[in-house]
């Protein structure tokens, strides 16, 4: 199991293949992605690499983190993330990770934060059908209906689907196919959509359920 990388979502586009089919693509950019540190089985209980991306002003870094970046002999990074790896896949600290870490035709898993939707009703948040449009229903057309029972149990059970904050959740999309890799522009083109807003950060790693590569 090797490390993943941190990328930044640029936006979406589309291309046509040889059959005339339109393929939706998400463009992600990999820029200044470096190894910041190691986590070892002997010291931390597991093997992992700490990856950082995008340079950050030294004035905006806390004193403890300044020492971390100084020990790694790299410039401060905006985003840090750990990736679990097997023992034989350690990479030297300060080594750079480029877009050619992946290849066209490879399947990957992508983890990102979904776009926040604010306070949403039950129909939007949980796909409820709502109440009747007429026949005695007044004002409550988009409500979720009953929330509990009666004096016993006298409470609303945890996990009850109700209106509330929607979005801003960490989501992993599995088995997305890499359409192409543009090394000059530092871009990876991925088939399909990816969670998150424009310029948000996401992590890309090898698919754990589908490892076949078709070029």
Swiss-Prot record:
- The domain of life is Bacteria
Q: Which InterPro entries match?
A: Ribosomal_uL3, Ribosomal_uL3_bac/org-type, Ribosomal_uL3_CS, Transl_B-barrel_sf
Q: Name one GO molecular function term.
A: structural constituent of ribosome
* GO annotation terms (biological process): translation
Alphabetic keyword roster: Methylation, Ribonucleoprotein, Ribosomal protein, RNA-binding, rRNA-binding
Q: Which PROSITE patterns match?
A: RIBOSOMAL_L3
Q: Which GO terms describe its cellular component?
A: ribonucleoprotein complex; ribosome
Residues annotated as coiled-coil are none
Record's comment on post-translational modification = Methylated by PrmB.
Q: Where is this region: Disordered?
A: 136-155
Indicate where the modification N5-methylglutamine is found in the sequence: 151
Recorded hits in Gene3D superfamilies, A to Z, give: 3.30.160.810, Translation factors (2.40.30.10)
**Biological role stated in the UniProt entry:** One of the primary rRNA binding proteins, it binds directly near the 3'-end of the 23S rRNA, where it nucleates assembly of the 50S subunit.
Homology family: Belongs to the universal ribosomal protein uL3 family.
Q: Provide the assembly information.
A: Part of the 50S ribosomal subunit. Forms a cluster with proteins L14 and L19.
Name the UniProt record assigns to this protein: Large ribosomal subunit protein uL3
Where does this protein come from, organism-wise? Rickettsia canadensis (strain McKiel)
What is this organism's lineage? Bacteria, Pseudomonadati, Pseudomonadota, Alphaproteobacteria, Rickettsiales
């Amino acid at each position: 199991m090797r490390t993943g990388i941190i990328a930044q979502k640029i936006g979406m586009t589309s291309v046509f293949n040889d059959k005339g089919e339109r393929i939706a693509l998400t463009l992600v950019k990999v820029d200044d992605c470096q190894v910041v540190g190691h986590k070892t089985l002997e010291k931390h209980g597991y093997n992992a690499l700490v990856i950082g991306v995008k340079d950050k002003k030294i004035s905006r870094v806390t004193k403890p983190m300044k020492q971390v970046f100084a020990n790694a002999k790299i410039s401060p990074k905006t985003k840090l993330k750990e990736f679990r790896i097997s023992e034989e896949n350690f990479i030297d600290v300060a080594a750079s990770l480029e877009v050619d870490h992946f290849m066209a035709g490879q399947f990957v898993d992508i983890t990102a934060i979904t776009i926040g939707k604010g306070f949403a009703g039950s129909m939007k948040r949980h796909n409820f059908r709502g109440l009747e449009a007429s026949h005695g229903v007044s004002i409550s057309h988009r409500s979720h209906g009953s929330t509990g029972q009666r004096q016993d149990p006298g409470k609303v059970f945890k996990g009850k689907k109700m209106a509330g904050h929607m979005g801003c959740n960490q989501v992993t999309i599995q088995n997305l196919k890499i359409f192409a890799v543009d090394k000059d522009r530092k871009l990876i083109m991925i088939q399909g959509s990816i969670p998150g807003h424009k310029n948000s950060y996401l992590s890309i790693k090898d698919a754990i359920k589908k490892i076949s590569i078709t070029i």
